[in-house]
């Protein structure tokens, strides 16, 4: 077999520039002919003919001169070129001078391999007419009878066949050199001279550099424009053209770091070459094709071994760097964006639907950076557990679009922010909360007057539309309200009543005691005791219009739990003791009282930190802001005599206190007595899905209990039951068996009735959850035959109830919560009652509870006066007792503020985040700014991080807000190196907030240094304290997870002892 050196000696290259002619457009063109002749076989000649103008020669001269200067540093040896002139350019002398200079330039390049192998010369002859030796009979000029006939041929005849064949002559060394240049960011010969491979000629060899001087003649000849093995006849070149196209695509994919696709194209090209070479007649050409085929096959195998996808038996192993190379078919053209329809905007991403498959995705756009950096390698993870999946990506001229999985559960903080003691201004994205400068307290009592039932009917019908998901913003204190960004918008809030003047811009005093002092100092205005019609009861007569208004809105859906519960409300008017109930009209004084800060008045009972997550019943009743329903009072009617009621109103003005301090535990909203008993329900928050699920179980016992005897009815049940307890289940529907739904029944709110009378209707609410933290929240609605209603903590410590509602109506009661306040007229603190009138105001409070209520002392601050002779009345204690009331409220608030998310849930969430971060670190990705906005939930309640990737064309950025809130490690944004330890700090900051209920920056506003001791409440376990302390180390080298063992140090920490890591990896 002949060597490259021998073949190079056999080839001679000749260039001629002839026949200058005037182009129809007015400029002069020259015919350029390039011939390659074999010295051993002079008949073996190949020829290319192109027509060029002066500007083309000038451009080629400049490019070849630059290459020659970089190689030899002797620019004076390079042939000069004629200068361009405007006038006289059509003179024969000027044309001849230009023709001669062009011919000298081409002939000079024929003797230097770096020039005749250059891409510039290849582009110069692209599009020319190719002639073989059999066609070269006679002079070459015989092919162009006229200039006009030749130009169309030049434009239609391509030079692709020659370049395709040349692409097959690239040796494996040049390919390796190109790949090494991309991997090590070194300047390859192509980039040294500022040259780039185009898609048409990317397989051509690079321009020779200084290092190429040491290469053998064989290597340089392999990249020749006219290879040693001359082309076969036109009829036999089809397989070479197809194979050349595939090799070009393979090189292009290698440049894009898509090695899997490159290997595929290499193998397809090899298959074509092996199939086509079987019919090759020339032994020299056959050997050349086989040699190149072997080199391409070796290249494909080396790519597969280095970047191939894992085998099937390796699927169970943790994801490594192999998963960061996405399948080449994940990339889609920019035109595919037309197939997506935008459904909404969620934070900074789009919720879209693929119109072809009707599937929902998240579309995230990454803006390309103006500075392209080869230092950043593109890493596109696709096998990271507990992180949203990438379906495809689309690269446009300005952006990279990621089509991601939609985490249907939304953000974790959307659900747990209710239990984090953060004020609205401290939430991640919250609007300003203004404060009023003056507030009023209104006391209103029932009075006798005729009243129609129109407003009651409208209220009753509106109850059907109130059955929305519970909001999660209003909580124990204003500091726990959170308005962080939501992943799951779209849930409408309950419609506000027309006469509702309530506003979310309420002010809070610093203490109930302060409120009490102010209340005692103010003078009650006598003129404010305005008479107002309230209720009408006429013997045994029944207001059929008022009664019919109840079932009017219940017939729509008799299967829902809300409808089943309302069905029992129809029994509020039994046949043996019917009473007509109508609704009051809204007075001006009531409308003015809407802006009173007292309308948030409540005490929330939250027990130990070991309780599972749930919404306390008190917040269900009193967290919403719209006009409350006025109470209805029905008295035992022994003689069927008609009852009438008087309404009086007292007004107290006081200055609002200063704005509460951020994170203050004793800051509680001020609520009017009027609004305390019957809080409004229309101010539901938008976009707040509730994890509570209403279970329709055990409703049969409700019907039986309601049917056992005559039932009394109060509007309290309407306002609470219809508008608070009944909500639609959210996406996190928990599948619990009937046995799991059984728990201790909890007593309800009893209406104001004779203790010796028939049993009253009651509602019970259950708050419990499974021990498995994945089953987050459960709420059930039930009924009991007891005359009282409350939410009691279960005797099982795993199922301790939240938000205990208690009632105190009899002397032997062991509960406290239902307060009957007699507001005496003329300031006399004495009991006033008669058979005709009763002036009372009802205030319902939630108080703290222990697990065993039977052991409690009766602690009702306002109880039914047992010494009163047979009269249904209530006694208001003196000023001293009122003072003690508010002191007790402050103490109970401090106890309620100690509620935290159970560590069992946090442990599960933390373990899932550790697995996700470890997988990202194996891919080579450091999140740096992991914060609550990156923590999502799937439809089953498991953690899913937002998608993290790295792109060479996209500049790495860090969330400035996360840095300010100390979710980022101290070294982020500094001059020190950012390592994987940054993410372990972020994990510690997130866990700190989950465990303590406050953000890290709130507890340590001055930052954390090497000697900082973290402030954590006593309820946090020692294991959790140790974990947080080790994660939040100022020195990244001392941080847990930054040692030699890496993430194994975190997994082996005692806090994660119950975690089955093997199960999480599945």
Curated annotation (Swiss-Prot):
Its EC number is 2.7.11.1. This is Ribosomal protein S6 kinase delta-1. Residues 448-458, 492-503, 582-593 have a biased composition (Low complexity). It comes from Homo sapiens. PANTHER family: RIBOSOMAL PROTEIN S6 KINASE (PTHR15508), RIBOSOMAL PROTEIN S6 KINASE DELTA-1 (PTHR15508:SF2). ATP binds at residues 801-809, 820. The modification Phosphoserine is found at residues 282, 423, 427, 449, 455, 494, 528, 583, 605, 608, 640, 661, 664, 667, 794, 872. Residues 212-223 have a biased composition (Basic and acidic residues). Highly expressed in testis, skeletal muscle, brain, heart, placenta, kidney and liver and weakly expressed in thymus, small intestine, lung and colon. May be involved in transmitting sphingosine-1 phosphate (SPP)-mediated signaling into the cell. Plays a role in the recruitment of PRDX3 to early endosomes. Residues 474-483 have a biased composition (Polar residues). Residues 8-132 form the PX domain. One of its GO terms (molecular function) is protein serine/threonine kinase activity. It is found in: Cytoplasm; Membrane; Early endosome. Keywords: ATP-binding, Cytoplasm, Endosome, Kinase, Lipid-binding, Membrane, Nucleotide-binding, Phosphoprotein, Repeat, Serine/threonine-protein kinase, Transferase. Transmembrane segments: none annotated. It catalyses: L-seryl-[protein] + ATP = O-phospho-L-seryl-[protein] + ADP + H(+); L-threonyl-[protein] + ATP = O-phospho-L-threonyl-[protein] + ADP + H(+). The PX domain is essential for its localization to the early endosomes. SMART domains: MIT, PX, S_TKc. One of its GO terms (cellular component) is lysosome. Residues 277-305 form the MIT domain. InterPro entries: Intracell_Sig-Traffick_Protein (IPR051866), Kinase-like_dom_sf (IPR011009), MIT_dom (IPR007330), MIT_dom_sf (IPR036181), Prot_kinase_dom (IPR000719), PX_dom (IPR001683), PX_dom_sf (IPR036871), PX_S6K-delta-1 (IPR042132). CDD domains: MIT_SNX15, PX_RPK118_like, STKc_RPK118_like. Interacts with SPHK1 and phosphatidylinositol 3-phosphate. Interacts (via PX domain) with PRDX3.
